[in-house]
Amino acid sequence: MQVTFLGTSSGVPTRARNVSAVALRLPQRSEMWLFDCGEGTQHQFLRSELRLSQLRRVFVTHMHGDHVFGLPGLLASLGLAGNSNEGVDLYGPDPLESYLNGVLRTSSTRIGYPLKVHRVHDCAENGTLVYEDDDLMVRCTPLTHRVPAYAYRVDQKPLAGRFDIAKAKDLQIPPGPIYAQLKRGDTVTLEDGRVIDGTTLCGPERPGVSVVYCTDTVFCEAAVDLAQGADLLIHESTFAHQESEMAYQKQHSTSTMAAQTAAEANVGQLVLTHLSPRYAPGNAVTPEDLLKEAQAIFPNTCLAKDFLTLEVKPRCNSL
């Protein structure tokens, strides 16, 4: 998995940071998922190496404009980018469908591919999966914000153990398509009549990776529970610690709240995003100050910036 930040500012864009959007690339299936879609996100795609035509799913955390104003335009442009017949599935709060229908209808915009909206409220409340396929699972949980908001967790299912080619050659198993079957752990009958159990040629299962996207929220235990043991936690950090009172009033997180969540959840790495424009470089408090505050609590923290790309690895610990 690869994570690319397309927008890392809160509320409004700045010269250096667009508003919220994070792309999750799944290279093994030539597919991409998007988390939030603030105004200007499709322009960010044009400035990146991402291919909009690979977009398959969009997960929306909440209905504030800096997280959704870019969605109608992006979906309209997607039809011109050669989107596949599979279409796009969207997941989010209850008002997401009526919002999109209203904008598309009043602007006389026609979407020429399948588009389906899934409400996540019941999944969040009941602890059921938002999405699952052969390789991945997605869960969500309610956050504490001024409007209904949800954090999402993507878990890759365990990977098959590594195939021992040397052992296969020692057994005089001829190379070819049969190796693919054995790699999957299938039992195969060879032309000479021998029956080979593929699991005997594979090492132990390897853990998949996990990513949690958590915004907008003040510190809450639900976020800690969702993020338990995750390899990568992307967490909003709207305010510096000295603005804690304002953070509680507006139900946003400080840098120290994000770090506290990461520490209590025992994640591999924390990335701070959704920074208030007030912390621009050269101001009294800068993004680097927020980073230092978080690192004092959770050392393996980095600061997101637009177009930063991370390769997600088990217990993610490096850029």
Swiss-Prot record:
Annotated gene: rnz
Catalytic reaction equation(s): Endonucleolytic cleavage of RNA, removing extra 3' nucleotides from tRNA precursor, generating 3' termini of tRNAs. A 3'-hydroxy group is left at the tRNA terminus and a 5'-phosphoryl group is left at the trailer molecule
KW Metal-binding (keyword) present: yes
Superkingdom, taxonomy of origin: Bacteria
Chain positions recorded as Zn(2+) 1 binding sites: 62, 64, 145, 216
Keywords from the UniProt entry: Endonuclease, Hydrolase, Metal-binding, Nuclease, tRNA processing, Zinc
Active site (catalytic residues): 66 (proton acceptor)
E.C. number(s) listed in UniProt: 3.1.26.11
Purpose of the protein: Zinc phosphodiesterase, which displays some tRNA 3'-processing endonuclease activity. Probably involved in tRNA maturation, by removing a 3'-trailer from precursor tRNA.
Cofactors: Zn(2+)
Top EC class, one word: hydrolase
Biological classification of the source: Bacteria, Bacillati, Cyanobacteriota, Cyanophyceae, Synechococcales
Family the UniProt entry places it in: Belongs to the RNase Z family.
Binding site for Zn(2+) 2: 66-67, 216, 274
Xref: SUPFAM superfamilies: Metallo-hydrolase/oxidoreductase
Organism per entry: Synechococcus sp. (strain CC9902)
Subunit architecture: Homodimer.
MF terms in GO: 3'-tRNA processing endoribonuclease activity; zinc ion binding
Pfam families in the record: Lactamase_B_2
Protein name: Ribonuclease Z
Cofactor stoichiometry and binding remark: Binds 2 Zn(2+) ions.
